[in-house]
């Protein structure tokens, strides 16, 4: 007879085989079935607990001992229904949960019995059907307490359970489950990820102790419409936090029904490189807490999961029964299991939100001001235990651009461990801070470990090293791995810190090999700190410190696969402490070279970085001499001019307290929504004195504010930690009012219809949508505006919740077209019966007819050309008399468009890609003298004078944005629209003056020039100052057959080929006038003034484009200087009567939006422009323009047009990506269907 371990090993092999073959079935709700038995107190007690001093009814785990027959009968019923995996009835079998009944001493026994009983039932079923073995998952539930959330709203740093207590509980439970015969460990219903991390830590410890390793299943719980866990994490952030467990599956269960769970399971299925499970509830509970979704109804939804390829394991949770499981098993039986995707290696961190770093990422700013050793202010606040202001320091770092925050509490007179724990617990209740990953920084291991026990996300340990020997290094690394943290590894060994390049490389290589080969540490989670030491100290041996570090970064990048690099940047300038301008210049120059050589991240003051090209040349030259150790006299030369720059840094700390100027009612609402307690008592008192009775403060502004909080929470715009903060504010306000209270002992016309409007996911443009909304609102329609960047599931959920009559989608950038198709598909899948309106700059009748309309047949899909047509379309769609005829005509029209498009595509002949290359322009490069820019590198122009930019505005697009057709200035005297245009223009001038005079918005530009050459006909290599390749720009070539011998153009044609030997150049720019525009527009919206809100955004757009025009003129005449004698008025500029071009990625000459990412990497790796890119490469703020500069005298604007598959395949090869990825981004340009 084989041993139990051998039997378990055989079962696990069978499990792996089964997962490859089919979708496995998990059982259903145990609690649901127990309730069906209608057990009484006596059943729970049995003989053994007849005299137990407290009630035990409801302790379902106790039935393992008092009514095992019931538990096994339920388990057998699930196996008979088709379940492959039984969950043990041990959801609450931990001491902390059993303590509610005074039964904590039974925890171990309950887990043993739970696994033993399930094992018996599973083995009996396997004996009946040997070809289909059944498995037992030992359940570890979440417990009744949370490690990340305080149970006391007045004390956010308090916890009623610790990580260590949970580990102790889970260790005991895991031992019992293994002893009882479990095949797997299932950590489920995770609403607080820190609890789950404690469970993982415990389970892995037991495995190591017992010398056995079982597969781990992990299942989280998305609790509401926000798509987050109760403790605030998104689905991807949750996965990043637990993936170190290397689970056999990750999934979601409970809280939501299958329908509501779908978008989160879909996301998980694309992100997780392991099997995916789902065991949703039987719908959502009704008013009586019961579940109404029938087996057939639930199976229909779950079958969609399987058909879409989301599932490897599926079962049920609350409200599900054996009948549900049987229906689900039958529904998914015909579908193959989900194929596990290959996810690229990357350091995947998380706070409340995910954060991914890889070799292609822009430089990562790690905020340093929450480091006691780096900030005197922060140190003082911590010593004074002024944690409220200390949290503000952290928040300022995040708002200033820190993507990770470094927290260090090492100070001789401080209890560092206690301070670290307190501060991290408080951060957990501050979503604006805890959304980013945490770097726990300490030289004391006990402080690091205490910090790791406080963060639910995947953070970074700073640091471990071989300073105390290899064994201690490996011990700490193993623990970091078990806690699920990335690590900063110092270049430090038994002989001390590495100070030379050779020592840095030697220690980093040795550390890497030990971590990867001996510890099994993921290489992508290793971040080397090769030691940044102070330069310009006057000691000759220190002169090469910066060069050694920079070269070490390059070594790490080139020789240690997937590893990253970091450093404490302020160390390099320590010898100039007290002289902030010089220090900032040193930091900027140092980072400029270190980033180019592979530095991934740096601990910096996120709000205080000087711009490399903005450093005065005299200072920058001396600093570069010091940083790069170019001359022996570099230090003396820098010291000689250092005092000239002394007297304050480039960036000042400032607190934004603008909201304090609001009315007291608005201040109270703001405080409640933001969770600010600082002024709540004085504001409450001020409001009390304005009211007739103190109770009116509660019934009025306080309840109004809490209604806002409730609305935001219900809509998924706030989540639990924020609501807890709001409740704390409310309590303080009410507490102030109670003594005063005790001392005292129209009809609305019906809307024509409700229309939901949204700018789709990935797109931030909303001017057109807002105008349409205003027009519809003025015509009696109730408009529900979801804003920008709205995912499909939110659009559809809101349409149902708001009982909308029409859904309207808007988008400006080409990737939005795909997202609209996705929404249409989802509407069809979910059987919506609502009309769909499509609008936006990139949309068209042809795209709507060809791509969107065929995806949704339940109701009409209508392309709306402009705001003026929206009312007529809406009226037709909602009219009983007009709709049928209108929809029929629209569909017939679209059928014609589709046929015409198909015929045109079939008729159109194009050159092969090779033929198109052969027909490129023939320029005389041998005789070409490329103009040389006045500088190379990047410069920033901050707070550009808006009055100057106003002279460059092209007003014609402004009128078009308001749906007034005509060319400026003739439109002002147009017979039809002249009066309206003039009135609008006068209002625009008044608003423009206000924006300029009051400096309500700001304009900024980042631009640069680099040496460049054409390679492979259609690509451009961009070079650094030393000739190294900084980036490759990928362009496309026209393939349409040209008449009269005209060439097939590519933007690459306008730069000299590499083989010509000509040193040519390219430029790039980002301009924005949107800084502050969103806030100004929202202020008008808050007053109900949609007109001026839209006006502000429209003018910001025009100013951003004007800024691009103004800057291009300066480039031509000054910065590049190839047209110094140019004299063009604004009309000539608008007509593009200049030499050179400034094409924008995503537009006709370079239609691939992803190239914008390369432009931003070259121009703005530190985020100094104030403009960022969304996942679909839209710029935010929306009032922004970016593009390339070409100076060749024959450079011209053109459209690439339709291209064929041969070019797409070559383009994809050059970009190093799958052709399907290129096809998605180039969809409007594809001249083929498959």
Curated annotation (Swiss-Prot):
Question: What SMART domains does its record include?
Answer: B12-binding_2
Q: Which reaction does it catalyse?
A: (6S)-5-methyl-5,6,7,8-tetrahydrofolate + L-homocysteine = (6S)-5,6,7,8-tetrahydrofolate + L-methionine
Which EC number(s) does the record attach to this protein?
2.1.1.13
> Which residues does the UniProt record annotate as the domain B12-binding?
752-888
Describe its function.
Answer: Catalyzes the transfer of a methyl group from methyl-cobalamin to homocysteine, yielding enzyme-bound cob(I)alamin and methionine. Subsequently, remethylates the cofactor using methyltetrahydrofolate.
Q: What else is known?
A: L-homocysteine is bound via the zinc atom.
Q: What is this protein called in UniProt?
A: Methionine synthase
What is the scientific name of the source organism? Answer: Pseudomonas aeruginosa (strain ATCC 15692 / DSM 22644 / CIP 104116 / JCM 14847 / LMG 12228 / 1C / PRS 101 / PAO1)
* Gene transcribed to yield this protein: metH
């Amino acid at each position: 007879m084989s041993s139990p371990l051998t039997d378990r090993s055989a079962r696990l092999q069978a499990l792996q085989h089964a997962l490859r073959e089919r979708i496995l079935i998990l059982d259903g709700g145990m609690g649901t079935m127990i309730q069906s038995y209608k057990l009484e107190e006596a059943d729970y007690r049995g003989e053994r607990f007849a005299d137990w001093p407290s009630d035990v009814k409801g302790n379902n785990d106790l039935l393992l001992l008092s009514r095992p027959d019931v538990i096994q009968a339920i388990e057998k019923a699930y196996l008979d229904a088709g379940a492959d995996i039984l969950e043990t009835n041990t959801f609450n079998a931990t001491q902390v949960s059993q303590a509610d009944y005074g039964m904590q001493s039974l925890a171990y026994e309950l887990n043993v019995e739970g696994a033993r009983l399930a094992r018996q039932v599973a083995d009996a079923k396997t004996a009946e059907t040997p070809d289909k073995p059944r498995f037992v998952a030992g359940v570890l539930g979440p417990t009744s307490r949370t490690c990340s959330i305080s149970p006391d709203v007045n004390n956010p740093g308090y916890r009623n359970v610790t990580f260590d207590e949970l580990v102790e509980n889970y260790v005991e439970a895991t031992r019992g489950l293994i002893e009882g015969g479990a095949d797997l460990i299932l950590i489920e219903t995770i609403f607080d990820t820190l609890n789950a991390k404690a469970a993982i830590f415990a389970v892995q410890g037991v495995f190591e102790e017992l010398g056995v390793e079982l597969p781990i299943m992990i299942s989280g719980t998305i609790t509401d419409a926000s798509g987050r866990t109760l403790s605030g994490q998104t689905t991807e952030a949750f996965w990043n936090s637990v993936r170190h467990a290397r689970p056999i599956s990750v999934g979601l269960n409970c809280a939501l029904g299958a329908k509501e769970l779908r978008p989160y399971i879909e996301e998980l299925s694309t992100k997780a490189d392991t099997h995916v499970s789902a065991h949703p509830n039987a719908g959502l509970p009704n008013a009586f807490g019961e579940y109404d979704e029938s087996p057939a109804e639930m199976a229909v939804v779950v079958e969609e999961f399987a058909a879409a390829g989301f599932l490897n394991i599926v079962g049920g949770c609350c409200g599900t029964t054996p009948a549900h499981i049987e229906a689900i098993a039958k529904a998914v039986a015909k579908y193959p299991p989900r194929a596990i995707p290959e996810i690229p290696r990357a350091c995947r961190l998380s706070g409340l939100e995910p954060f991914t770093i890889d070799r292609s990422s822009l430089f990562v700013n790690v905020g340093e001001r929450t480091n006691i050793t780096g900030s005197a202010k922060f140190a003082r606040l911590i010593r004074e235990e002024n944690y409220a202001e200390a949290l503000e320091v952290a928040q300022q770092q995040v708002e200033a651009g820190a993507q990770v925050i470094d927290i260090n509490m090492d100070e001789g007179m401080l209890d560092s461990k206690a301070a670290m724990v307190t501060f991290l617990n408080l951060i957990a209740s501050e979503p604006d801070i805890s959304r980013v990953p945490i770097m726990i920084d300490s030289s004391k291991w006990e402080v690091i470990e205490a910090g790791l026990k406080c963060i639910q996300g995947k953070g970074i340990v700073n640091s471990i090293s071989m300073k105390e020997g290899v064994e201690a290094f490996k011990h700490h690394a193993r623990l970091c791995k078990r806690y699920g943290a990335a690590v900063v590894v110092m270049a430090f060994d038994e002989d001390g810190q590495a100070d030379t390049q050779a020592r840095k490389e030697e220690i980093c290589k040795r550390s890497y090999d030990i971590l990867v080969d001996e510890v099994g540490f993921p290489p992508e989670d290793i971040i080397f700190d090769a030691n940044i030491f102070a330069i310009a100290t006057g000691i000759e041996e220190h002169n090469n410190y910066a060069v050694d570090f920079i070269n070490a970064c390059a070594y790490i990048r080139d020789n240690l696969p997937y590893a990253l690099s970091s450093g404490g940047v302020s160390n390099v300038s320590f010898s100039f402490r007290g002289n902030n301008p010089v220090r900032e210049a040193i930091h900027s120059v140092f980072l400029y070279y270190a980033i180019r050589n592979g530095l991934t991240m740096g601990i910096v003051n996120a709000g205080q970085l000087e711009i490399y090209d903005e450093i005065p040349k005299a200072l920058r030259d001396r600093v570069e001499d010091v940083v790069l150790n170019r001359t022996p006299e570099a230090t003396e030369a820098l010291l000689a001019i250092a005092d000239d720059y002394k007297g304050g840094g480039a960036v000042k700390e400032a607190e934004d307290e603008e909201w304090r100027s609001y009315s007291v009612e608005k201040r109270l609402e703001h405080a409640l929504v933001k969770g600010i307690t600082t002024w709540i008592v004085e504001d409450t008192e001020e409001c009390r004195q304005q009211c007739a009775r103190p109770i009116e403060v509660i019934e009025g502004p306080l309840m109004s504010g809490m209604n806002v909080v409730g609305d935001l929470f219900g809509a998924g715009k706030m989540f639990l930690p924020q609501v807890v903060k709001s409740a704390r504010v409310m309590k303080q306000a009410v507490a102030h009012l109670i003594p005063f209270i005790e001392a005292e002992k129209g009809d609305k016309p019906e809307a024509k219809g409700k229309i939901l409007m949204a700018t789709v996911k990935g797109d931030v443009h909303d001017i057109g949508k807002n105008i349409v909304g205003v027009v519809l609102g003025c015509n009696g329609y109730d408009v529900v505006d979801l804003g920008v960047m709205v995912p499909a599931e939110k659009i559809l959920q809101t349409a149902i919740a708001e009982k909308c009559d029409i859904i309207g989608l808007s988008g400006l950038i080409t990737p939005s077209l795909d997202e609209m198709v996705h929404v249409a598909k989802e509407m069809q899948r979910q059987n919506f019966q609502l009309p769909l309106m499509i609008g936006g700059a990139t949309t068209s009748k042809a795209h709507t007819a060809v791509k969107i309309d065929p995806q949704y047949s339940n109701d009409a899909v209508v392309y709306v050309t402009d705001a003026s047509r929206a009312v007529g379309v809406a009226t037709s769609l909602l009219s009983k008399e007009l709709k049928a005829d209108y929809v029929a005509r629209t569909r017939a029209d679209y059928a014609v468009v589709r046929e015409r498009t198909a015929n045109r595509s079939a008729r159109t002949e194009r050159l092969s890609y090779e033929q198109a290359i052969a027909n490129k322009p023939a320029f005389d490069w041998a005789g070409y003298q490329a103009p040389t820019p006045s500088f190379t590198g990047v410069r920033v122009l901050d707070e550009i004078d808006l009055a100057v930019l106003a002279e460059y505005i092209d007003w014609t697009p402004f009128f078009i944005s308001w749906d007034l057709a005509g060319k400026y200035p003739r439109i002002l005297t147009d017979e039809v629209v002249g009066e309206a245009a003039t009135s609008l223009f006068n209002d625009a001038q008044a608003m423009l003056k206000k924006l300029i005079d009051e400096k309500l918005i700001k304009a900024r530009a980042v631009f640069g020039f680099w040496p460049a050459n054409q390679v492979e006909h259609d690509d451009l290599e961009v070079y650094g100052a030393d000739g190294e390749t900084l980036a490759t720009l990928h362009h496309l070539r026209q393939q349409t057959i040209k008449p009269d011998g005209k060439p097939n153009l590519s933007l690459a044609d306008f730069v000299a080929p590499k083989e010509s030997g000509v040193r040519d150049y390219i430029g790039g720019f980002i301009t924005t006038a949107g800084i502050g525009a969103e806030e100004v527009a929202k202020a008008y919206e808050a007053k109900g003034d949609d007109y001026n809100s839209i006006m502000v955004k429209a003018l910001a757009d025009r100013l951003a484009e004007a800024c691009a025009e103004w800057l291009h003129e300066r480039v031509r005449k000054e910065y590049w200087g190839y047209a110094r004698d140019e004299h063009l008025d604004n009309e000539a500029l608008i007509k593009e009567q200049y030499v050179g071009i400034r094409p924008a990625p995503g537009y006709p000459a370079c239609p691939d939006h992803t190239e914008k990412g390369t432009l931003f990497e070259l121009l703005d790796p530190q985020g100094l422009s104030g403009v960022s890119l969304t996942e679909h490469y839209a710029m935010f703020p929306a009032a922004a323009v970016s593009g390339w500069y070409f100076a060749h005298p024959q450079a011209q604007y053109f459209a690439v047009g339709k291209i064929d598959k041969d070019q797409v395949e070559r383009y994809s090869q050059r970009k190093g990506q799958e052709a399907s990825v290129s096809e998605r981004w180039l969809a409007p340009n594809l001249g083929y269907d498959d």
